[in-house]
Amino acid sequence: MSLLDYFRSTKKPNTASLAKERLQIIVAHQRSGRGGGAPEYLPKMKQEIIEVIRKYVQISEDQVSVQLDQNDDNLSVLELNVTLPDTK
């Protein structure tokens, strides 16, 4: 029976590998912050994004987060987080 149980078992995520992955994300994030800061256009882009969102939903500036992450592989990721109000 143990052989069948081996094939049936679903692998649970290893907490060590999950912690390692999260730590790598944090380190990459901190390294990208050291490289000269955010580009000049980022604050203006954030303002324009907020203006577009405000056409449809009432939000404040602290409900929008815009972040540009760059890594060594010449790859940039623009992360936009918007906290929308509850609709009832």
UniProtKB/Swiss-Prot annotation:
Belongs to the MinE family. One of its GO terms (biological process) is regulation of division septum assembly. HAMAP family: MinE. Signal peptide: none annotated. Prevents the cell division inhibition by proteins MinC and MinD at internal division sites while permitting inhibition at polar sites. This ensures cell division at the proper site by restricting the formation of a division septum at the midpoint of the long axis of the cell. Keywords: Cell cycle, Cell division. This is Cell division topological specificity factor. The keyword Cell cycle applies. The keyword Repeat does not apply. The gene is minE.
